[in-house]
Amino acid sequence: MNLACVLIVAVLFLTASQLATAASYARDKQEYPAVRSSDEMQDSEDLTLTKECTDDSQFCDPNDHDCCSGECIDEGGRGVCAIVPEHV
């Protein structure tokens, strides 16, 4: 009877120590999971909602009109984004 009690206590102790180790390991791996997931969501929304344009004086596709200035000057199949002066 005494040996059975010692074995039960030993098993309970080992189980408790394993649970404590697993909980601290999981806590270290998931630092602020809600903040991280909302940051990932924000990044994915930024990628889908923003359209990048080609800067002035950079090469562009005359058929696509992807210039920030809105004007791609055709240079024989390859275009250059027009430089538009800013209004002061």
UniProtKB/Swiss-Prot annotation:
Belongs to the conotoxin O1 superfamily. The presence of a 'disulfide through disulfide knot' structurally defines this protein as a knottin. The lineage of its organism: Eukaryota, Metazoa, Spiralia, Lophotrochozoa, Mollusca. May act as a neurotoxin, but produces no obvious effect on ionic currents when tested on the mouse dorsal rooted ganglia (DRG). GO terms for molecular function: ion channel inhibitor activity; toxin activity. InterPro entries: Conotoxin. The keyword Secreted applies. It comes from the Eukaryota. GO terms for cellular component: extracellular region. This is Conotoxin VxVIB. Keywords: Disulfide bond, Knottin, Neurotoxin, Secreted, Signal, Toxin. It comes from Conus vexillum (Flag cone). Residues 1-22 form the signal peptide.
